[in-house]
Design a protein with these regions (language model features):
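Outer membrane beta-barrel transmembrane domains
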Residues: 80-192
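Residue-level signature of outer-membrane beta-barrel architecture
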Residues: 38-44, 60-62, 75-77, 153-155, ...
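Membrane-embedded beta-strands of outer-membrane beta-barrel proteins
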Residues: 34-38, 71-73, 149, 185-187
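Conserved mixed alpha/beta catalytic, RNA-binding, or beta-rich assembly cores of soluble enzyme
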Residues: 64-88
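A general structural signal for well-ordered alpha-helical packing
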Residues: 55-57, 70-74, 107-113
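Transmembrane beta-strand segments of outer-membrane beta-barrel domains in Gram-negative
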Residues: 1-66
């Protein structure tokens, strides 16, 4: 209720002339949320012209919302020389200015990313860690697979990209057991 999800969904349904959403009485109840996330990335290798690389990615999330560990791979094929991972839009680390030794270089690359996650707890499905007063909760799938393929480009302060995403189901026995897939198109501008 505190996130105003019901109100937002009702506005969207009204704009697109969809039927009124139902079922909000069954939503997961409000709870205190505190999570700690940490990530580790390592370049596994690059070619001589530095326009092709492979990177190991890992992430650990602990807290009252998510408890999960993820490992994955990100490969990039650059149309020009790739930026290192500590200065690349692939890792959202291109926020540099004149006070850093790094420059905001032009990047243009295709990428493929896969990950496998072990999920110990997901409050968005299971409800709060501290109380069990949500009317409907489920046990999540403990293993989740994600894949993404796309293109990213940046020049000066502009970032553009598009991607195709696939996520395996978070639950078993859904009407659609084939996972979720969708496209993404994004633009951004860095003010600093």
């Amino acid at each position: 209720k505190s996130a105003f999800g019901q109100e937002l969904q009702e506005v969207v349904h009204k704009i697109y002339n969809f039927r009124n959403p139902d079922g909000w009485k069954y939503q997961i109840r409000n709870a205190i949320a505190l999570n700690f996330d940490t990530e580790y990335h390592k370049t596994l290798g690059t070619n001589k012209s530095n326009n092709l690389d492979g990177n190991f990615k890992s992430k650990l999330r602990l807290g009252t919302i998510f408890n999960e560990a993820t490992i994955g791979f990100l490969g990039r094929i650059g149309f020009k020389e790739l930026q290192p991972i500590h200065n690349s839009i692939a890792f959202n680390t291109h926020l540099n200015n004149g006070n850093t030794p790094f420059v905001r270089g032009v990047e243009s690359f295709l990428y493929y990313e896969t990950s496998l996650a072990y999920v110990a707890y997901d409050a968005t499905i299971q409800g709060s860690l501290f109380n069990n007063n949500s009317p409907i909760t489920f046990k999540p799938n403990t293993i989740r697979f994600n894949a993404e393929i796309g293109y990213k480009f940046t020049a000066k302060k502009w970032v553009f990209g598009y991607a195709y995403h696939f996520h395996s189901n978070k639950l078993n026995n859904l009407r659609n057991n084939r996972g979720n897939d969708y496209g993404q198109l994004f633009f951004s501008y860095l003010f600093r």
